[in-house]
């Protein structure tokens, strides 16, 4: 018989191994009408805890300047949301009962494990990182969500790295089930001294929604009734990042470009389908490019398009990402003619996003002894449960330097 699949649970311990945090996932989905709740468990060494309390915080922050520029008490960082949860001693009236995963973890880890729970507001931005330049140091700019667990006598007490756990989670969106209409655009250019004759450009995409890594098919149709000659046709994909903080500024960055020496003579027509694929691997040196995660990690890609709920307050949205295909005709002695086609670039909703149901089995009548060596979790009953523990750190690209505890995703 093969091994039955287990429920994956991510864990990370403090440097002194006295505190361990467990989460069922690292990415939390924004469904527009609701956001996945953050439910986890923190395990504490009781001998180390003594008379202190256990706090867990969730912070959404927007860093809009390099960390090495934080001088004279000025920080290029704005906290968009902060929530605190006292995991131990438990509050008299907890906000909600433990979830199913928390119940299973509490039974497995024993009496020194304590649940925590956060609700992410719907108006908070999704996680976006702006790609740093080759010479940039410190934390990258962008929006991130951090969970921090620590022991202290009060929430105001300063915590130390050695006895605290920091985890960067991501708030993500997946592609909608019903995509929008097929993008298309057209324009007509009249030239001076051309006897009212015109150059007509029409372009369209085969669909509106594309997944990361999927090629885009751009259909270009040119009707040249003018006396001008189209010398070249350029097709490019541009990423637009609207930075919404104190004021709104827009940055654009080409992520894929294609240039063909396709000429369209006067009084002729032309039709062709161009294929172009925007990939992060072709843009790893571009400073300020919006990404879904850290550049050093394997699951990183170009930032997904941001889907904004109708009526949302854009002032607290952080970074809004969108994409457009630009088709440009290079015309001899007459200026260029171009159109833009907006499209959506996202990940499909994974099939394993919903946790598989636990196999039906009769409940055990006898109590299972809990091992005292909880920090290492060398348990004797692993074969009786379907929980699989995995380190929280994400897989790195080969050759990337390890930043140890300062790494945002470790």
Swiss-Prot record:
Disruption phenotype: Loss of beta-2 adrenergic receptor/ADRB2 ubiquitination. Reduction of dopamine-dependent behaviors, loss of Akt1 regulation by dopamine in the striatum and disruption of the dopamine-dependent interaction of Akt1 with its negative regulator, protein phosphatase 2A. Increased serum LDL-cholesterol levels upon high fat diet. Exacerbates insulin resistance. Elevated cytotoxicity of natural killer cells and lowered susceptibility to mouse cytomegalovirus infection.
GO MF entries: angiotensin receptor binding; D1 dopamine receptor binding; molecular adaptor activity; protein kinase B binding; ubiquitin protein ligase binding
Record key words, sorted: Cell membrane, Coated pit, Cytoplasm, Cytoplasmic vesicle, Hydroxylation, Membrane, Nucleus, Phosphoprotein, Protein transport, Signal transduction inhibitor, Transport, Ubl conjugation
GO biological process, one term: protein ubiquitination
Keyword Membrane: yes
Motif ([DE]-X(1,2)-F-X-X-[FL]-X-X-X-R motif): 386-396
Matches recorded under Gene3D superfamilies: 2.60.40.640, 2.60.40.840
Region described as Interaction with TRAF6: spans on this chain: 241-410
Transmembrane feature ranges: none
Phosphothreonine modification, residue list: 383
PTM notes: Phosphorylated at Thr-383 in the cytoplasm; probably dephosphorylated at the plasma membrane. The phosphorylation does not regulate internalization and recycling of ADRB2, interaction with clathrin or AP2B1. The ubiquitination status appears to regulate the formation and trafficking of beta-arrestin-GPCR complexes and signaling. Ubiquitination appears to occur GPCR-specific. Ubiquitinated by MDM2; the ubiquitination is required for rapid internalization of ADRB2. Deubiquitinated by USP33; the deubiquitination leads to a dissociation of the beta-arrestin-GPCR complex. Stimulation of a class A GPCR, such as ADRB2, induces transient ubiquitination and subsequently promotes association with USP33. Stimulation of a class B GPCR promotes a sustained ubiquitination.
Modified residues (Phosphotyrosine): 48
Top-rank taxon: Eukaryota
Modified residues (Phosphoserine): 361
Localization per record: Cytoplasm; Nucleus; Cell membrane; Membrane, Clathrin-coated pit
Gene Ontology CC annotations of this record: clathrin-coated pit; cytoplasm; cytosol; endocytic vesicle; glutamatergic synapse; nucleoplasm; plasma membrane
SMART domains: Arrestin_C
InterPro entries: Arrestin, Arrestin-like_C, Arrestin-like_N, Arrestin_C-like, Arrestin_CS, Arrestin_N, Ig_E-set
Principal subcellular localization: cytoplasm
Hydroxyproline sites (modified residues): 176, 181
Region of interest (Interaction with AP2B1), ranges: 364-410
Tissue: Predominantly localized in neuronal tissues and in the spleen.
Subunit structure: Homooligomer; the self-association is mediated by InsP6-binding. Heterooligomer with ARRB1; the association is mediated by InsP6-binding. Interacts with ADRB2 and CHRM2. Interacts with PDE4A. Interacts with PDE4D. Interacts with MAPK10, MAPK1 and MAPK3. Interacts with DRD2. Interacts with FSHR. Interacts with CLTC. Interacts with HTR2C. Interacts with CCR5. Interacts with CXCR4. Interacts with SRC. Interacts with DUSP16; the interaction is interrupted by stimulation of AGTR1 and activation of MAPK10. Interacts with CHUK; the interaction is enhanced stimulation of ADRB2. Interacts with RELA.
Family according to the record: Belongs to the arrestin family.
Function comment: Functions in regulating agonist-mediated G-protein coupled receptor (GPCR) signaling by mediating both receptor desensitization and resensitization processes. During homologous desensitization, beta-arrestins bind to the GPRK-phosphorylated receptor and sterically preclude its coupling to the cognate G-protein; the binding appears to require additional receptor determinants exposed only in the active receptor conformation.
Protein name: Beta-arrestin-2
């Amino acid at each position: 018989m093969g091994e039955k699949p287990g429920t994956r649970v991510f864990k990370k311990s403090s440097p002194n191994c006295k505190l361990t945090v467990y989460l069922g996932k690292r990415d939390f989905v924004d469904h527009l009408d609701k956001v996945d709740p953050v439910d986890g468990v923190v395990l504490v060494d009781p001998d180390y805890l003594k008379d202190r309390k256990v706090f867990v915080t969730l912070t959404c922050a927007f860093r809009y300047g390099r960390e090495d520029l934080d001088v004279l008490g000025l920080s290029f960082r704005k906290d968009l949301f902060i929530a605190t949860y006292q995991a131990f001693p438990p509050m008299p009236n907890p906000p909600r009962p433990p979830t199913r995963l928390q119940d299973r973890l509490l039974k497995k880890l024993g009496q020194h494990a304590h649940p925590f729970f956060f609700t992410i507001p719907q108006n908070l931005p999704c996680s976006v990182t702006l790609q740093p330049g080759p010479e940039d140091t410190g934390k990258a700019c962008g929006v991130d969500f951090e969970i921090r667990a620590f022991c202290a006598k009060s929430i105001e007490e300063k915590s130390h790295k050695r006895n605290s756990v920091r985890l960067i989670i991501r708030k993500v969106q997946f592609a909608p089930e019903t995509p929008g209409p097929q993008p298309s655009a057209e324009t007509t250019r009249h030239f001076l001294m051309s006897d009212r004759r015109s150059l007509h450009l029409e372009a369209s995409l085969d669909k509106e929604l594309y997944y990361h890594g999927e090629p885009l098919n751009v259909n270009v149709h040119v009707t040249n009734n003018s006396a001008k000659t189209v010398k070249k046709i350029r097709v490019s994909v541009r990423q637009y990042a609207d930075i919404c903080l104190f004021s709104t500024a827009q940055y654009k960055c080409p992520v894929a470009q294609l240039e063909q020496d396709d000429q369209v003579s006067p009084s002729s027509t032309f039709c062709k389908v161009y294929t172009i694929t925007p990939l992060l691997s072709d843009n790893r040196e571009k400073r300020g490019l919006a990404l879904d995660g850290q550049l050093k990690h394997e699951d990183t890609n170009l930032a997904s398009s941001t889907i904004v709920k109708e009526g949302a307050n854009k002032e607290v949205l952080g970074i809004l990402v969108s994409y457009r295909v630009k088709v440009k005709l290079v015309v001899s002695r007459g200026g260029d003619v171009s159109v833009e086609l907006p499209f959506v670039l996202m990940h499909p909703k994974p099939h394993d996003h919903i946790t598989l149901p636990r196999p039906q089995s009769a409940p055990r009548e006898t109590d299972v002894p809990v091992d005292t060596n909880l920090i290492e979790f060398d348990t004797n009953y692993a074969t009786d449960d379907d929980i699989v523990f995995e380190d929280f750190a994400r897989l790195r690209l080969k050759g990337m330097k390890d930043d140890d505890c300062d790494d945002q995703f470790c």
